[in-house]
Swiss-Prot record:
Protein name, UniProt field: Serine hydroxymethyltransferase
Species the sequence originates in: Agathobacter rectalis (strain ATCC 33656 / DSM 3377 / JCM 17463 / KCTC 5835 / VPI 0990) (Eubacterium rectale)
Chemical reaction(s) catalysed: (6R)-5,10-methylene-5,6,7,8-tetrahydrofolate + glycine + H2O = (6S)-5,6,7,8-tetrahydrofolate + L-serine
Keywords of the record: Amino-acid biosynthesis, Cytoplasm, One-carbon metabolism, Pyridoxal phosphate, Transferase
Gene3D superfamilies: Aspartate Aminotransferase, domain 1 (3.90.1150.10), Type I PLP-dependent aspartate aminotransferase-like (Major domain) (3.40.640.10)
Cofactor names: pyridoxal 5'-phosphate
Pathway listed: One-carbon metabolism; tetrahydrofolate interconversion; Amino-acid biosynthesis; glycine biosynthesis; glycine from L-serine: step 1/1
Subunit structure: Homodimer.
Modified residues (N6-(pyridoxal phosphate)lysine): 228
GO molecular function, one term: glycine hydroxymethyltransferase activity
Amino acid sequence: MYTLDDIKKEDPEIASAITDEFERQNSHIELIASENWVSPAVMSAMGSILTNKYAEGYPGRRYYGGCECVDEVEELARERAKELFGAEYVNVQPHSGAQANMAVQFAILKPGDTIMGMNLDHGGHLTHGSPVNFSGSYFHVVPYGVNDEGFIDYDKVEEIALECKPKMIIAGASAYARTIDFKRFREIADKVDAVLMVDMAHIAGLVAAGLHPSPIPYAHVTTTTTHKTLRGPRGGMILCSQEMQDKYNFNKAIFPGIQGGPLMHVIAAKAVCFKEALQPEFKEYQKQIVKNAQALCKGLQSRGIKIVSDGTDNHLMLVDLTPFGLTGKSIEKLLDAAHITANKNTIPNDPQKPFVTSGIRLGTPAATSRGLKEDDFDKVAEAIAMIIKEGESAVEPAKAIIKTLTDKYPLAF
């Protein structure tokens, strides 16, 4: 296996950037909800010689010779994913969650078909119908959102569906802190003869551990990323019944539809990730993610910080900065100076532009992987609240709090 020393010999500039990034991650508390730390085994699989192998097609039906070993890798990944989520069909080749979503939409829909997805400003995702994304360009999009309390209004979703008669309803989000009722979504979809697609990218780890209701029994087709709460490599996946695969041929939609050769080193890392997620320790890790999110949320609220929907059921939360007249952009910068990594994020009915925003999104998966517990997250909440309330003058005191945590939980790599 190659090491950083090998990179230093060939490319000292890249080696320096990698070293700097390690130091940044080690000295910061990562609260970006979509980030996590993979295991050494997952990382080793991604850096393996499998990156050398081209393998267009699927196991047993490749367009290249010498694929018997990578066939075994892909079969292991598929079978483990089936066991993990209880799905009949799995495709592990999507390079990303966005490409998994694209493949599903292109397999089922025609240009101009009507789809419903959560408004990006209310917590949805670009690929759920945003006008700046392919999904908003190829299809007629009718968005739904959250009510004044920050919850999905399922009666309103049904009302919109009955009016616009969509071909597809997309459930799932990138910034929604509450449990999603997939059963209710399926009932709505059935009333208008729509396909229900669920994007569980953010909550896949919680679903695998049984801490969030699974979409698999209700969705016609489910997509996900393999990183985030699942703690695997960056990549995507499609899951559904064999009947849905037979009807829409998602295999063909991925290859040759929107991709060429699969990334076999990443698929190997996915297989390792799925095996890790099948272990009892993974469920305990997911439980700690939720406990930590609730501790962070309560810690912020007890210090006068407003949380959208007044709480969280999963791994993330949205902080509403409007009571302080602040922007997500400014607070993200101050938090970074205090060695807290978070991202600015729109809140429902946000008056600010998407690159400015009135909120920040916080998540606990990465810091939980690092080892932080509830008491530690209360200290993180203290540091964040100081920054929001006191501004630049609080950067150094907040940074000192964070240093006690990063010293206590150094990165293992």
